[in-house]
């Protein structure tokens, strides 16, 4: 670049270049027929490099440089895409007083295929209906473990690159792992949680501590709201109904009792008591519990810090191992927790082994004595509200997680790509409420969850590399993003095709929101056949259909299809980027370009073919005409 001497604005320097080198149409012609910029920009263009030998560079760099183009191609090459294509390389010029620039734009199309046809471990049994509830809860259990388990990044690799498949050079370990997760049959127990694993693996030391803490908080809350389900006190519920006196006199096991607030820092005791990792055995012990209640617990925990459940959820989800003293020092316990919430959260964060980068906001002033008296009266009423304590616990945990997410770096903070699971749990909750959990919806739920996790992981990767890298986004802009999903049968024929489009710099994050909502809503249509006329409009509203998002008939075909026919799903990610074209100020490069353009124009006028790049063609002579003006401060050149 130092030798190239890049120039962006050529407003008062146009006469230094050949006419074809300064206009969008001229650069398009040069890029396509002379230099082949779509490939040349990927070469080493240092003076004298092998790529610059002979026609048309003659040991000089190219007269233009497409800023960001090489990084775009490298970003796509570093991922697990099976195919990559770059088309519609175009140039546009912007001319206004004092400003004349040229931009390049390209459409990238990258795709890969995932094997979704293997459901044997999940749902293929001789008597499926007899084991439906067990299968459903087993699937939920494995998924919840993937959501809440304290996942650690990969360790133990002495090198970060390993030998790939036949014919490949060494590839990053992360790429091999992502390729491994493309097959639902092969990855088996590791089918779930791919997006979370990759998020942890890409985190820095500070982010790793924060993400692990957030995961512990969600795990603790999930264990808290399910503790009443596995509580030993539940074993004697039948006896309590028959003999209330015996129930009141029977003490609860001491190891399951924890009084709150035991001190001001109740959060530490809460996390210490409940943050044991969620494992399959714990979830399987809940099989006697209605699936609908289990799903409510899952949604409440996974959706943290967003989406406070309705009040009736707290009546159904009660922590069973906390003994709540109704009053402490004349004040309601729940109100005490609410008053001290900010202080407890700040102390918890300050104890973490990370340096905080956000200035602490001073706490609000204490309430006057008159207000305290009024609040005490309100507390007595508030304590009677069923579920108030559970609601306060969730509110505190949610606020703590929200503050921890603000401490994350920008790359680790973008959690919108990892919230897709909530849509699928809510779809399962609706099916459970309707009593419509059968083989077909469960098959579709598994397949679409697996596909959505792949889409979320890929969109997050593209977002981090193309939209969240400041050096790149300072120059290159994302204009359009599109995801195409093609379901194929065992012989490769397309069963249905779906398209989602979004525009702007936030296109990737908007896409995952639309896709997860769309596919989760389609789960409920599994096994119902074709939609009736009166159902189509409602279904389109549920999936938030937008114009230019694919054929409506394809959407209806997807809803009605039998998912056992689908063997694989091809995912195509298309995105259009626009970046700047830099011009050279080096006189030697300009002279070579002037000679090459004049010679190519002469050959074209004579209807002759242009030489291929690297052809052994002597350097053409300088075309006749007036000497181009010198750049400011340049010395006159003597010709011999």
UniProtKB/Swiss-Prot annotation:
Keywords: Covalent protein-DNA linkage, DNA replication, DNA-binding, Host nucleus, Phosphoprotein, Viral DNA replication
Modifications after synthesis and translation: Preterminal protein is used to replicate viral genome, upon genomic encapsidation it is processed first into iTP and finally into TP by adenovirus protease.
List of residues that carry O-(5'-phospho-DNA)-serine: 549
One Gene Ontology cellular component annotation held by this UniProt entry: host cell nuclear matrix
Signal peptide feature range: none
UniProt motif (Nuclear localization signal) ranges: 351-360
Site (Cleavage): 157-158, 320-321
Cellular compartment(s): Host nucleus matrix
GO molecular function, a single term: double-stranded DNA binding
Any single biological process term in GO: DNA replication
Top-level taxon in the UniProt lineage: Viruses
Start and end residues of each stretch annotated as Disordered: 232-257, 614-640
Residue numbers marked as site, Priming of strand displacement replication by covalently linking the first nucleotide of the new DNA chain: 549
Biased composition (Pro residues): 620-634
Recorded family membership: Belongs to the adenoviridae terminal protein family.
Function of the protein: Protein covalently bound to the viral DNA that acts as a primer for viral genomic replication by DNA strand displacement. Assembles on the viral origin of replication in an initiation complex with viral polymerase, DBP, host NFIA and host POU2F1/OCT1. The terminal protein stimulates the template activity over 20 fold compared to protein-free templates. Neo-synthesized viral genomes are linked to two preterminal proteins, one for each 5' end.
Subunit: Heterodimer with the polymerase; this heterodimer binds to bp 9 to 18 of the genome. Interacts with host POU2F1; POU2F1 binds to the auxiliary sequences in the inverted terminal repeats and tethers the pTP-POL heterodimer to the origin DNA thereby participating in the assembly of the pre-initiation complex (POL-TP-DBP-NFIA-POU2F1).
Protein name stated in the entry: Preterminal protein
Organism (species): Human adenovirus B serotype 7 (HAdV-7)
Lineage summary: Viruses, Varidnaviria, Bamfordvirae, Preplasmiviricota, Tectiliviricetes
């Amino acid at each position: 670049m130092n030798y190239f001497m890049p120039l962006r604005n050529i407003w008062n320097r146009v006469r230094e270049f050949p006419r074809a080198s300064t206009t969008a149409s001229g650069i398009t012609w040069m890029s396509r027929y002379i230099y082949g910029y779509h490939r040349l920009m990927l070469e080493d263009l240092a003076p004298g490099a092998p790529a610059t030998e002979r026609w048309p560079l003659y040991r000089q760099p190219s007269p233009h440089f497409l800023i960001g183009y090489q990084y775009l191609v490298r970003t796509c090459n570093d991922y697990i895409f099976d195919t990559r294509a770059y088309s519609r390389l175009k140039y546009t010029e912007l001319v206004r007083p004092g400003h004349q620039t040229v931009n390049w734009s390209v459409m990238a199309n990258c795709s890969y295929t995932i094997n979704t046809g293997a459901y044997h471990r999940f749902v293929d049994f001789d008597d499926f209906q007899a084991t439906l509830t067990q299968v459903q809860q087993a699937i939920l259990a494995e998924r919840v473990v993937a959501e809440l388990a304290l996942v650690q990044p990969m360790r133990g690799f002495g090198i970060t690159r390993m030998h790939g498949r036949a014919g490949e050079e060494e590839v990053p370990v992360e790429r091999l792992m992502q390729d491994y997760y493309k097959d639902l049959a092969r990855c088996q127990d590791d089918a779930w949680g791919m997006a979370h694993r990759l998020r942890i693996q890409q985190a820095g030391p500070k982010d790793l501590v924060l993400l692990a803490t957030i995961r512990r908080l969600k795990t603790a809350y999930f264990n808290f709201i399910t503790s009443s389900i596995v509580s030993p006190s539940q074993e004697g519920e039948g006896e309590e109904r028959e003999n209330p006196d015996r129930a009141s006199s029977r003490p609860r096991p001491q190891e399951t009792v924890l009084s709150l607030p035991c001190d001001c820092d109740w959060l530490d005791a809460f996390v210490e008591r409940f943050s044991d990792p969620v494992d399959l055995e714990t979830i399987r012990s809940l099989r006697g519990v209605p699936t609908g209640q289990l799903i409510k617990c899952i949604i409440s925990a996974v959706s943290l810090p967003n989406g406070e459940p309705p009040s009736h959820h707290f009546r159904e989800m009660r922590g069973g191992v906390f003994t709540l003293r109704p009053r402490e020092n004349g004040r309601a316990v729940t109100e005490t927790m609410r008053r001290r919430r900010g202080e407890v959260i700040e102390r918890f964060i300050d104890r973490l082994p990370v340096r905080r980068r956000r200035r602490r906001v001073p706490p609000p002033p204490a309430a006057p004595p008159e207000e305290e008296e009024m609040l005490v009266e309100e507390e007595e009423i508030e304590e009677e509200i069923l579920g108030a304590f559970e609601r306060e616990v969730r509110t505190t945990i949610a606020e703590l997680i929200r503050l921890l997410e603000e401490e994350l770096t920008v790359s680790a903070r973008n959690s919108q790509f990892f919230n897709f699971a909530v849509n699928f749990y809510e779809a399962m909750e609706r099916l459970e409420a309707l009593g419509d959990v059968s083989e077909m919806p469960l098959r579709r739920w598994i397949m679409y969850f697996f596909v959505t996790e792949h889409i979320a992981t890929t969109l997050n990767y593209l977002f981090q590399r193309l939209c969240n890298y400041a050096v790149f986004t300072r120059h290159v802009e994302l204009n359009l993003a599109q995801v195409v999903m093609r379901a194929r049968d065992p012989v490769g024929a397309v069963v249905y095709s779906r398209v989602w489009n979004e525009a702007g710099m936030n296109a990737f994050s908007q896409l995952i929101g639309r896709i997860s909502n769309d596919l989760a809503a389609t789960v409920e249509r599994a096994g119902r056949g074709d939609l009736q006329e009166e159902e189509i409009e409602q279904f389109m509203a549920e999936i938030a259909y937008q114009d230019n998002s694919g054929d409506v008939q394809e959407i209806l075909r997807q809803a009605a299809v039998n998912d056992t026919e689908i063997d694989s799903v091809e995912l195509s990610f298309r995105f259009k980027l626009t970046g700047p074209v830099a011009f050279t100020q080096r006189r030697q490069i300009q002279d070579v370009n002037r000679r090459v353009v004049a010679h190519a124009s002469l050959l074209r006028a004579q209807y002759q073919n242009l030489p291929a790049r690297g052809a052994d063609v002597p350097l053409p002579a300088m075309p006749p005409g007036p000497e181009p003006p010198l750049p400011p401060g340049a010395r006159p050149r003597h010709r011999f």
